A protein has these predicted regions:
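Active-site cavity-forming subdomains of large catalytic enzyme subunits
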Residues: 44-115, 119, 123-132, 142, ...
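Hydrophobic helix-and-loop "lid/oligomerization" segment in the mid-to-C-terminal part
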Residues: 1-50, 70-71, 88-91, 97, ...
């Protein structure tokens, strides 16, 4: 949800500012997570000179280096943790050598609030950009529903700035005229006048998520961008059906994972589900964590490797612990 919403915020806003812009949504299984060399080369071959990442890129040091070697301009917008290595002098942070890196979790970043999701990073970038162009922020504020949607679904802390965004975003959804978002609300049979954070986090969000999990997130992006009601209704119905399918797969996988977890008393549970669809590993990990109150990593078979996703508890910094054994992984982030 966060990636789709941040991509949509950037796409819609940059287009409004007159940029020639398109959105590429990596296929979760074929392309993996985030930007990669194949996508960069494809963009370069098509004559594209600038790449702007959203909700990813902070861990893409080599990929950014490759884009720069081709003479491309690359801007990273992300909210994930900055990778680092431990040295005798302390932590050495590994920041991609992009033309600009916008991430409030950088050590030297003075932005006061550190719990933004990717869509809010995109929203703040566009807000600053329109201000520098001397353009009214009215159009930017119309994007608050998407920032609110991502904020709730990415489960960031609902404090300070995030609480305000969700509060005002919910109010704006009730009066939203966007065809795509309204089509999804209708497909889910939600009364717009009574919409709240539950509907965002447990009804609308999962439908957007299901697109990227079982098909391609491009379908969700197409829905949000659609201006034709008939086409939007078809896309929304398709996303709703995908989510229903995802629910059934998740229930089955969760049952298997809990059965496996019963046989182990480890402080951190690592569960291998051979036939699990890799896109729902994180959801299953979250369900097992809730049941066992332990950090959980769910692994499954992927092309040429084993792939997984983890969910932790408040007392355990999973990303920090993974960094201690990073040589065991081909790639990871958080």
């Amino acid at each position: 949800v966060d990636g789709v919403c941040s991509g949509y915020i950037l796409y819609r806003s940059l287009k409004k500012l007159g940029a020639v812009v398109d959105v590429v949504v990596p296929h979760r299984i074929e392309d993996g997570y985030g930007i990669n060399e194949n996508l960069i080369k494809k963009a370069f071959d098509q004559g594209i000179d600038t790449i702007l990442t959203c909700d990813n890129g902070i861990a893409a040091y080599n990929q950014v280096e490759y884009a720069k070697s081709l003479g491309m301009t690359i801007i990273v917008t992300d909210h994930h943790e900055v990778p680092y290595t431990e040295t005798e002098q302390g932590r050495e942070y590994i920041i991609p050598k992009a033309d600009a890196v916008i991430n409030h979790k950088q050590k030297d970043c003075g932005y006061p609030f550190k719990e933004l999701c990717g869509a809010m990073v995109a929203f703040q970038l566009i807000s600053a950009l329109t201000e520098s162009y001397g353009i009214s922020k009215r159009d930017v504020y119309r994007l608050l529903p998407y920032a609110a949607l991502a904020t709730v679904c990415d489960v960031v802390e609902l404090q300070g700035e995030n609480r305000m965004v969700v509060q005002y975003g919910l109010k704006m959804i009730k009066n939203c005229k966007d065809v795509g978002l309204n089509a999804l609300i209708d497909a889910c049979k939600i009364d717009k006048n009574n919409i709240d954070s539950y509907h965002i986090g447990f009804v609308l969000g999962p439908c957007i998520n299901a697109s990227g999990r079982l098909d391609t997130a491009k379908k969700a992006m197409e829905l949000l961008s659609e201006t034709n009601k008939e086409k939007a209704d078809i896309l929304a119905t398709s996303l709703k059906e995908l989510n229903d399918e995802r629910k059934a797969m998740t229930e089955e996988g969760t049952k298997k994972a809990i059965e496996i977890a019963k046989d182990y008393d480890d402080n951190v549970l690592v569960i291998y589900l051979k036939d699990c669809h890799e896109s729902i590993a994180g959801i299953i990990a979250g369900r097992v964590r809730e049941r066992c109150n332990k950090p959980v990593i769910v692994l499954t078979d992927a092309k040429d490797c084993v792939k997984g996703s983890g969910r932790s508890i408040e007392e355990y910094d999973m990303y920090e612990e993974l960094c201690k054994v990073k040589d065991l992984f081909l790639k990871f982030g958080g």
